[in-house]
């Protein structure tokens, strides 16, 4: 039978128009990593070409490495193969067809010439994606880190999303910094099989429910959209179909039908820089078998996972069939958002290590929930906990909703895709990504010990720190606490507004080591002593819960405010023994129960600091210093002199002290002892009072303009407004 000549077309730079026909003996040229398409014409008719004819090409690269690449039936008498390689040089191929008697398909030989890539598309310039060496992130083949910021477009191959709309949405997401689109090419979620909603401009993808008869025209239209994403530098994460009970692709087509479908997807899109998501809301032995078939069929070894109900890793029966753990953490509002991070951390802790990322969480605007503050919380909370990336979603966009047709069997939202495209969360996540990309973010590791509970921290020791402080409520301007700053490493700090992207400079910060000792313990003559022996308590007055003298102790319960009445002065030093299992405080400059200084140790925070109480309000902790493990009995020494006050603590083995801090209460008052609310009971002993005279020490680092993070703890200035903030500390070169 007459056979037409072999036609070849190179999809250089993803131009949709093919190159002109090339003679069979010639080798077409394609640039590295860019697909080349080769078309074969069958020499004889085949009654069921998609079901009965399998065509593969065995390519051998210049190094002699063979690679089996599946081809796909393109309609009529045509079969096509798409091939790409990072290896420069001449690649030879030979066809291998199940119809061995068809000389147009079987035993054909040829070659492709791969030349260096000269374009600017990062997906081609840096090469295919892979798991990074740290097993926590993704990178290109050349080692360039890949930041996964995904968007959810489950149904955007359907005809409700017009070609013009697809281009508009792609341009918007590219401009905002998105790098991945999760898109279904198979049975859709939230609709029945073979409904009209499934169609694109060329109809449905299959003509039979077992996927034995394909509609090549459908995939021709889909090709243009997949190619357009890649041309924009966006990786298509292709979902092979949905697996939930009400829209179960496995039940629809059977495992053999799903396997045929996946071979077809690999043949069409394997040469592109794609990611495989085997099934949506899928799992169990059958989907694991499909994932194994994908692994064995795909010659390019693309990254693969499952979109799960909860965790991809826990959804498969063999972890070897996936490369990373994709999570779905649930929809809703703040309860779902705050619950997402513990779920992420649990997945991150599983061994052996693999990249973990949230692939579905609270869609923005979904049933009128999960607006931008929720989106920012999940983004920053997961990224600073070790995530390989995040996939965002917006109402309207994921289901390709248009006015009058939301594209859903059960309507969650009537939001159109244009409205969802403009939700502010997508812009704000893009701003966060751009900030992280200004630093070696792929080397960041989570460091929760760098900040207080409720905030998130990550970075590189002695180089850069990121701290995300979620919104604490209205009228709360308190900034986060930075802990464990390295000794003598100068940092530059700034607040980053994750909403607007504005920066607020905080200047330089340094940990010069332990704070200089603010005063010498008991360096003045005694004015008063009390060892609490006997029952005479006439020198004292209880302004809180009653105190009791017994066996050399002054004991009190929560709310204890016991004041020495007879001595009034502004510059005094008090030393007293106490137990370390409850709060212990020394009162200075007491004027009333609502107006005094207190220098205290608290076992709940394991820290010492001062409060300048005024008008019944405590104000911010002053001079807070962490205290290591200490013995059961401690001695506190507190002093106030002029505009400064400080506290020293010792257990006989080790000593800790605050810096001298400036206080607003500078007038003469009385002294006493204190237990507010931590611990059931405190027993004070050996009370000593003397005059005090000291000033803040002059010694310090050469960089006198830097904020002092004594002993490694930095209490940041108030945030510019009560919302969530990102604090960045970047080390300064000498």
Task: Show the residue positions of the predicted features.
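Carbohydrate-binding surfaces in secreted/extracellular proteins
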Residues: 236, 532, 574-576, 629-660
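Short, aromatic/His-centered strand-loop micro-motif at the edge of beta-sheets
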Residues: 614-635
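Extended acidic/polar, glycine-enriched regions
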Residues: 58, 65-133
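Secretory/extracellular carbohydrate-interaction modules
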Residues: 555-614
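Aromatic- and carboxylate-lined catalytic core of secreted/periplasmic carbohydrate-active enzymes
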Residues: 26-30, 45, 352, 363-366, ...
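Extracellular glycoside hydrolase catalytic/binding regions
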Residues: 260, 274, 279-419
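Flexible glycan-contacting loops in extracellular carbohydrate-active proteins
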Residues: 657-683, 697-713, 718-720, 728
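Active-site mouth of glycoside hydrolases
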Residues: 117, 122-324, 328-335
């Amino acid at each position: 039978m007459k056979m037409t000549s072999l036609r070849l077309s190179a999809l250089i730079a993803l131009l949709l128009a093919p190159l002109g026909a090339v003679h069979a003996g010639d080798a077409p040229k394609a640039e590295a990593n860019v697909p080349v398409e080769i078309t074969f014409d069958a020499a004889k008719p085949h009654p069921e070409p998609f079901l009965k004819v399998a065509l593969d090409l065995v390519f051998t690269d210049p190094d002699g490495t063979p690679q089996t690449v599946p081809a796909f039936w393109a309609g009529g008498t045509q079969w096509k193969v798409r091939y790409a390689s990072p290896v420069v040089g001449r690649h030879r191929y030979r066809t291998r067809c199940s119809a061995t008697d068809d000389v147009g398909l079987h035993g054909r030989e040829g070659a492709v010439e791969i030349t260096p890539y000269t374009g600017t598309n990062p997906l081609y310039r840096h090469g295919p994606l892979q798991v990074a060496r740290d097993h926590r992130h993704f990178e290109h083949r050349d080692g360039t880190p890949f930041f996964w910021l995904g968007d959810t477009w489950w149904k955007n191959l359907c005809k409700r999303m017009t070609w013009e709309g697809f281009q508009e949405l792609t341009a918007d997401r590219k401009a905002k910094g998105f790098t991945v689109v999760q898109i279904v090419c198979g049975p859709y979620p939230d609709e029945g099989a073979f409904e009209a909603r499934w169609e694109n401009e060329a109809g449905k993808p299959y003509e039979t429910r077992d996927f034995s008869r394909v509609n090549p025209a459908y995939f021709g239209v889909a090709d243009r959209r997949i190619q357009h994403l890649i041309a924009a530098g966006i990786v298509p994460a292709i979902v092979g179909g949905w697996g939930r009970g009400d829209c179960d692709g496995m039940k629809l087509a059977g495992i053999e039908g799903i396997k045929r479908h996946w071979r077809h997807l690999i043949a069409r899109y394997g040469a592109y820089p794609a990611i495989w998501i085997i099934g949506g809301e899928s799992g169990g032995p059958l989907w694991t078998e499909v994932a194994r078939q994908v692994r064995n069929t795909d010659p390019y070894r693309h990254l693969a996972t499952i979109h799960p109900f909860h965790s991809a890793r826990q959804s498969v029966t063999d972890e070897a069939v996936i490369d990373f753990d994709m999570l779905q953490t649930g929809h809703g509002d703040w309860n779902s958002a705050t619950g997402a991070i513990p779920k992420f951390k649990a997945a991150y802790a599983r061994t052996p290590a693999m990249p973990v990322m949230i692939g579905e969480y609270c869609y923005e605007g979904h049933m009128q929930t999960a607006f931008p503050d929720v989106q920012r919380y999940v983004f920053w909370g997961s990224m600073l906990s070790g995530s390989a990336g995040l996939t965002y979603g917006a109402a309207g966009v994921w289901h390709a909703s248009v006015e009058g047709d939301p594209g859903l069997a059960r309507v969650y939202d009537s939001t159109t895709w244009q409205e969802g495209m403009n939700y502010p969360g997508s812009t704000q996540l893009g701003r966060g990504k751009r900030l992280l990309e200004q630093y070696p973010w792929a080397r960041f590791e989570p460091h929760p010990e760098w900040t207080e509970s409720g905030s998130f921290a990550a970075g590189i020791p002695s180089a850069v720190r990121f701290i995300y402080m979620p919104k604490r409520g209205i009228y709360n301007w308190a900034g986060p606490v930075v802990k464990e700053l390295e000794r003598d490493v100068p940092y530059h700090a700034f607040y980053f507004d994750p909403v607007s992207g504005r920066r607020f400079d905080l200047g330089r910060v340094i940990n010069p080591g332990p704070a200089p000792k603010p005063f010498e313990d008991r360096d003045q003559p005694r004015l008063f002593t009390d060892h609490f022996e006997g029952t005479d308590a006439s020198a004292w007055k209880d302004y809180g819960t009653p105190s009791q003298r017994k066996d050399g102790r002054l004991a009190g319960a929560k709310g204890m405010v016991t004041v020495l009445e007879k001595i009034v002065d502004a510059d005094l030093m008090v030393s007293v023994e106490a137990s370390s299992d409850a709060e212990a405080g020394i009162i200075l400059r007491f004027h009333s129960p609502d107006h005094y200084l207190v220098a205290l140790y608290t076992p709940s925070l394991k820290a010492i600091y001062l409060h300048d109480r005024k008008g019944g309000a405590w104000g911010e902790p002053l001079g807070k210093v962490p205290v290591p493990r200490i013995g059961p009995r401690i001695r506190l020494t507190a002093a106030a002199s002029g505009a400064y006050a400080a506290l020293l603590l010792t257990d006989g083995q080790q000593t800790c002290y605050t810096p001298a801090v400036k206080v607003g209460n500078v007038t003469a008052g009385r002294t006493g002892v204190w237990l507010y609310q931590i611990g059931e009971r405190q027993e004070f002993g050996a009370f000593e009072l003397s005059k005090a005279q000291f000033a803040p020490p002059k010694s310090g680092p050469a960089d006198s303009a830097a904020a002092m993070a004594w002993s490694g703890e930095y209490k940041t200035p108030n945030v510019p407004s009560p919302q969530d903030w990102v604090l960045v500390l970047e080390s300064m070169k000498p």
